[in-house]
Amino acid sequence: YPCKLNLKLGKVPFH
């Protein structure tokens, strides 16, 4: 998943 989506999900941002 994109960083932005991970931030929304509350997970660690993956680049």
Swiss-Prot record:
Q: What does this protein do?
A: Antimicrobial peptide which displays antifungal activity and antibacterial activity against a wide range of Gram-positive and Gram-negative bacteria. Has antibacterial activity against the Gram-positive bacteria E.faecium ATCC 19434 (MIC=2.5 uM), E.faecalis ATCC29212 (MIC=2.5 uM), S.epidermidis KCTC 1917 (MIC=5 uM), S.mutans KCTC 3065 (MIC=5 uM), and the Gram-negative bacteria E.coli BW25113 (MIC=5 uM), P.aeruginosa ATCC 27853 (MIC=10 uM), S.typhimurium KCTC 1926 (MIC=5 uM) and S.enteritidis ATCC 13076 (MIC=5 uM).
Sorted alphabetically, the Gene Ontology BP terms of this entry are: apoptotic process; defense response to bacterium; defense response to fungus; killing of cells of another organism
State the UniProt keywords alphabetically: Antibiotic, Antimicrobial, Apoptosis, Fungicide
| Induction summary | Up-regulated by infection with E.coli.
Source organism: Periplaneta americana
Could you list the residue ranges forming a coiled coil in this record? Answer: none
Q: What is this protein called?
A: Periplanetasin-2
